[in-house]
Amino acid sequence: MSYWTLADLISYLRMPFLAGWGLTALGSTLLYFRQNDLIYPANVPAGSRTQVPEPTQFGIRNADSVNLQTPDGETLHAYLLRPANSSISKNCTIITFHGNAGNVGHRLPIGKILADTLGCYCFMAEYRGYGLSTGSPSEEGLAIDGQTVLDYVRNHEELKNTRIIVYGQSLGGALTVKLVQANQHVGDIAGVILENTFTSIRKLIPSVMPVAKWISVLCHQTWKSDETLAKMTKTDIPFLFLSGLKDEIVPPEMMRTLHSICPCRKSWHEFPNGHHNDTVAEPGYFDAIWAFLIHE
């Protein structure tokens, strides 16, 4: 299909990339030794490490495929999407970090809406060990990836003078929190968008894998978003929280906790019928982002 309508895009976005976090797939005895495989199921759905959809498949014409080099020698794949209509351009670049399954190509419908409808540059970053990127994922590695992406945008001739918005979904939200907290005093992050993000992996385990709740302390991939968010001291960076109230993987209470902890200027939008993977397809989702971009 060479051209997709908005209705087509929304239908595609409702396709579940992951029925449940990998933690539910194997016994609790494997939590410690196999946790990276469970937390970062880069091969779900099948073929995700080799079959990466391209922008033209979604009618996106003004886009680049980019390779970034990390300081520790990995190559990250990414897409840069440009606004289709300069007359509605918000002069901002939205850096997107996706959830723990699939690849950056699966999220191109989101990028198309951000670029074509909202008029933003959209830099869709891939993690190490996902899609066409090299390496193996880990909390430490993804933190390096996030910093590499942010530095690339900061120094990109076309993007460096735009407002930078960092937008993360689920695991990508945890990376967003870590990245923004580490870079808050540089002064070039204009906003943060978090969707269906957990407080920490250890606190999430009892929800997705009750039989393992007593050994969650063994989890070394911690992603302590609640503790990291509480360390924000530059409180003029605005945050937008987007929460699906029917999220079957990350309890909505975790998003409320993050919202409560966040010391920055913040706004909250909830979607009564939003599940973990399809909140982005709920009515009003992109309206909330549009309003955030206009007012912040």
For each predicted feature, which ranges?
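Primarily recognizes the serine-hydrolase "nucleophile elbow" in alpha/beta-hydrolase
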Residues: 152-156, 161-207
